[in-house]
């Protein structure tokens, strides 16, 4: 009885009623069964929250995934997902259902992220006025449905990446927003690993859509990818 009461209070505090909760959960397919062979591998998924497809956030995440893959090429699989390719309605996080006949892409994305072979998730966003993009926020808000599914992202390793127009342009604030959402999912949040080892990957875009000249920023990107992979492998091995 106590657990049901606590859950009801949480949903009320989040602005989600019983009917709205059912609307959210009804859009999510059941988690697929995982094969024994798939369980031996660890998948790292990077999510680009930029509305500009294939630009600097995607490029930075690609570098992070390459660094993750290099940790153990035989066991690590990687995938980049760009939210710019998807239809996501952030209003559903507040329990506002889609119009009759409408669909969006979150249910398929939720199934992919919650799969047992996914050991790590890196979320990246450009910096917009010291915070993440509305697209990235809508995605993280929609992940409330995964929290409601017995914390489907729990114990997956999370990393955050931010690309700003100047060196100190709000990257760390953006990282903190992404990391806060991950912690609410019971994810294991890591930052960029040594030797930089601060709060995550912080990248500077000089305005020419070229981040390759940002040596320090790209080092944090590589360290983040490596660290996410290292911890995900340890988690998979039960260490």
Regions found by a protein language model. Give the residues of each.
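Short, glycine-/small-residue-rich phosphate/pyrophosphate-handling segment
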Residues: 152-195
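N-terminal beta1-alpha1-beta2 submodule of the flavodoxin-like/Rossmannoid cofactor-binding fold
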Residues: 3-6, 11-149, 198-239
